Amino acid sequence: MAKAKIAVNGYGTIGKRVADAVKAQDDMEVVGISKRTPNYEAAVAHQLGYDIYAPAENVGAFEKAGMPAAGSVEEMIEKADLVVDCTPGGVGEKNKPLYEKAGVKAIWQGGESHPIAGFSFNAVSNYEGALGRDLVRVVSCNTTGLCRTITPIDRELGVKKVRAILARRATDPNDIKKGPINAIVLHPVKLPSHHGPDVRSVIPHINITSAALLVPTTLMHLHTVNMEVDTDCTAEDIKKIFSSQSRIRFIGQGITSTAEIMEVARDIKRPRNDMWENCIWPESITVDEKEFYFFQAIHQESIVVPENVDAIRAMMELESDGAKSIEKTNKALGM
């Protein structure tokens, strides 16, 4: 079977990780990545052997910088079966006509809204619904983290309601322009935050409300989650369900912070210190009748990366079984 030809439009925090993840698979390949300007990320992409494409008006700038562009973004799109759009939120919507004109499939990230594709994706929740689709949106890091925990609990115990409080990292580690650096910001003041409604774009029947704060850190998000279920359960029941999920990692051995989780990622030699899994403290799982609580940490730079790979596989119909795709992706990444 020929490999699916994938273009990555936007080579930033998510795009560079998606490109490497696609490259690691045996049923898909990267035909090119795009950058607007010949900055350090473009230089690294060039060193890694990726064909770089740029807006037509910027191709000359890449030539002058010593990293000749392989062509325009439009030319890259023409070579692809599917484009993974990893451009900043709002930019992806402007790119949609390019993909439609070229007749290629497209994936957007959670920075775009649900209507851009009409289908929001999470591998464990609705893989089969993405089979053969032309347009898909992979939900954000926080929504991905919530869906990964809600779905297996709902299947085993039935979820009556979810209440989630999200302490969101202020920005990514390489971002020197954003904050806060000495404040906690209500984000937003008016409740709910967008995360609850976004979960429902994937799992429509779930009753969920969310609240979010921005905190002065760049490492990870931290969720405090409360679920009420339909069935009596114990903390051990919840742990058993979570432990059955390959993209949930239990955190222990004295770890009480996101900093220590990132140190674990370094110590196990993850690329870019990535932690693709939800990180849950099993000691935090506390049951009160049919309600339970837990803490989980979400690595915003990487958690959606395997989801993008699975979305590609579903849309290109390379694998019809979601569980098999998840296993294949995980193995290729070394998860």
UniProtKB/Swiss-Prot annotation:
- What pathway is it annotated to? Carbohydrate degradation; glycolysis; pyruvate from D-glyceraldehyde 3-phosphate: step 1/5
| Region forming the signal peptide | none
Catalytic reactions of this protein: D-glyceraldehyde 3-phosphate + phosphate + NADP(+) = (2R)-3-phospho-glyceroyl phosphate + NADPH + H(+); D-glyceraldehyde 3-phosphate + phosphate + NAD(+) = (2R)-3-phospho-glyceroyl phosphate + NADH + H(+)
| Subcellular location per the Swiss-Prot or TrEMBL entry | Cytoplasm
Molecular function terms from GO: 4-hydroxy-tetrahydrodipicolinate reductase; glyceraldehyde-3-phosphate dehydrogenase (NAD+) (phosphorylating) activity; glyceraldehyde-3-phosphate dehydrogenase (NADP+) (phosphorylating) activity; NAD binding; NADP binding
The residues listed in the UniProt record as binding NAD(+), with positions renumbered to this chain, are 13-14, 111, 169, 300
**Cellular component, GO, one term:** cytoplasm
Q: What name has this protein been given in UniProt?
A: Glyceraldehyde-3-phosphate dehydrogenase 1
Identify the species of origin: Methanosarcina acetivorans (strain ATCC 35395 / DSM 2834 / JCM 12185 / C2A)
Taxonomy of the source species: Archaea, Methanobacteriati, Methanobacteriota, Stenosarchaea group, Methanomicrobia
